[in-house]
Amino acid sequence: MGRLAAAFAASITLFGSTVTGVAAAPASADPSVQPVGSMPVPEGPAPSWIVADLDTGQVLAGRDMYSPHPPASTIKTLLALTALDEVSLDATVVATPAATQVECNCAGVTAGHTYTARQLLDATLLVSGNDAANTLADLVGGFDIAVDKMNAKAAAIGATDTHAASPSGLDGPGGPGWTTPHDLAAIFRAAMANPVFAQITAQPSAPFPTDAGVRPLLNQDELLVRYPGAIGGKTGYTNAARKTFVGAAERNGRRLVIAMMYGLVHEGGPTYWDQAAMLLDWGFAQNPAQGVATL
């Protein structure tokens, strides 16, 4: 937790700093790092971000990448990764009122209806359904057990500055939980190593059963249609977290992951999607042998 405490201090004292051409440094020394002599990283609405190689785990650049922020719905990537290790895709669960009567975004999960793990994964990742996330957590063992397993999974993959408070990213007992851009990228990297997760997060839509019939769930990751080579991602927003995003793209056989946290879009300024595209473009232009840290 020493790095987490240092990141809190850095985020308080150096929140407005800009990226400079410096070599890698501990988070407590400088929250913004990129290789010496590399091009300046474009500005955007997210003050806390990371760009890394999805395959090697090498970090190309970051700003406040060890600073903790509430994850909002990006924590659903950790839920999905945990569920994929715990249950089969055709495992079923009956939705409960407690799981479905939640603050929305909602996918339309109905109490008393039976759903498969695959249907709930689609609804959790594509449209960020909090009802689907809670029901998927029930399939894993229930709210508390699922959250414990999510935190154990995070620790196992090296995301040691992450604490999930709920399956959905909404506040749980004690608050909203936290993660860092570094950990969020590491979690997404681990999830993308699972072919089922990679297929789900890349699909533009998926069918979902409702009382009115099957309806399509449309992927909320706009980078899939805005950025050539985008291969998946997860959005998030709460008042505490502001806008969050984690995603990946491929170009010429090279895959990058980005994570962006605690941003607000200002009228007339670049959008989150603009910043995501700029970070990816910057990363693809860099020498893959140069890095500042590892995931």
Where are these regions (language model features)?
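Secretory targeting and sorting signals
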Residues: 1-29
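A generic alpha-helix preference that emphasizes hydrophobic side chains
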Residues: 10-11, 121, 181, 276
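Active-site-adjacent loops and short helices of periplasmic peptidoglycan-processing enzymes
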Residues: 21-182, 186, 195
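Penicillin-recognizing serine hydrolase domain
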Residues: 33-44, 145-295
